[in-house]
Design a protein with these regions (language model features):
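Nucleotide/phosphate-binding catalytic cleft detector across ATP-hydrolyzing
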Residues: 1-14, 18-151, 169-170
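Amphipathic coiled-coil signal-relay and dimerization helices
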Residues: 25-27, 163, 174
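Residues that cap or flank secondary-structure elements
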Residues: 107, 175-176
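A short acidic Gly-Thr/Ser loop motif
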Residues: 18-21, 152-159, 165-168, 176-178
Length: 178
């Protein structure tokens, strides 16, 4: 109520950043080959992301040694590839084949459901969910500084979040419980 009064705007949706001691990540590579040379669109890049997430989910199912059901809660593209060459961005370029290295993150169903329940109890709904290490690095380290090899450690009350950059990309992230 106080935020609504201060801003003069009703709050209905929130974006949340999840922490989790049981965070699991999978890094994978995915490619898509066009029938003929094409200009890469934003939709093509989004499709590539979805293919990467799907491939990571399949890989995670094979190694998941718990009885927990996990949800994909975030992902980051490490590198894009255009005709097997590393590119910063794919959109607008002509290509026969596109690809990406992608990090996909999973949290147990009960953690995700608990976050959604807490937001619901506040009379709000979730508009977007990410992970604390992804949110922290996006706020603290602009993309042009990610060419440096940087490790960002966000020390919190329950977990410390770690994000690592190299060659312009987030190459790893995770959480360490206290």
């Amino acid at each position: 109520d106080e935020l609504e009064k201060q801003t003069g705007q009703p709050l209905e949706e929130v974006c949340i950043a999840a922490a989790g001691r049981v965070l699991k990540t999978v890094t994978t590579h995915v490619e898509y080959e066009y029938a003929q040379e094409s200009v890469v669109t934003g939709e093509d890049v989004h499709t590539l992301d979805l293919l990467g997430i799907e491939k990571a989910q399949e890989a995670f199912k094979e190694v998941n040694d718990t009885s927990y059901k996990f949800y994909c809660v975030g992902y980051s593209t490490v590198k894009f590839f255009l005709n097997d060459e590393v590119f910063i961005s794919l959109e607008g370029h002509k290509a026969n084949k596109i690809g990406e290295d992608i990090i996909v993150t999973f949290l147990p169903e009960d953690v995700v459901d608990g976050l959604y329940a807490a937001v619901g109890q506040a009379g709000l709904s979730v508009a977007n969910m990410t992970l604390e290490p992804i949110a922290a690095i996006n706020v603290a380290i602009p993309e042009n500084y990610r060419m440096l090899n940087i490790a960002l450690v966000d020390v919190g009350a329950g977990t410390s979040d770690i994000s690592i950059t190299r060659d312009g990309s987030i190459i790893a992230y995770g959480m360490i419980p206290h």
